[in-house]
């Protein structure tokens, strides 16, 4: 415990909260351009080829974003919308690409779980 004299000399520093998605700069989503689309393998007990894209955002950051869903049309120079949200088994991937907006089309033949940019079936 500090003494009163020590507290007068220099006050307590407030705990600063660190953002988990700094590249978004406090915005809910950001637009960006794909610079490279490729696959990477997940951490240990999992095994797959996860689709990711290197994206240059309008905020100036270059980030790695996950492409969710089965099949995608993203390629180099595609304009995509990026949201926060990490992928637990991919180290360094802290963003998701939003399907169904800009150049990223929704997942084909999707009926349920339509958070993949799919219109509601009539």
UniProtKB/Swiss-Prot annotation:
It is found in: Plastid, Chloroplast. One of its GO terms (biological process) is translation. Keywords: Chloroplast, Plastid, Ribonucleoprotein, Ribosomal protein, RNA-binding, rRNA-binding. Its main location: plastid. GO terms for molecular function: rRNA binding; structural constituent of ribosome. It holds the Pfam family Ribosom_S12_S23. CDD domains: Ribosomal_S12. InterPro entries: NA-bd_OB-fold, Ribosomal_uS12, Ribosomal_uS12_bac. One of its GO terms (cellular component) is chloroplast. Gene3D superfamilies: Nucleic acid-binding proteins. Part of the 30S ribosomal subunit. Belongs to the universal ribosomal protein uS12 family. With S4 and S5 plays an important role in translational accuracy. Located at the interface of the 30S and 50S subunits. PANTHER family: 30S RIBOSOMAL PROTEIN S12 FAMILY MEMBER. This is Small ribosomal subunit protein uS12c. It comes from Chloranthus spicatus (Chulantree). The gene is rps12.
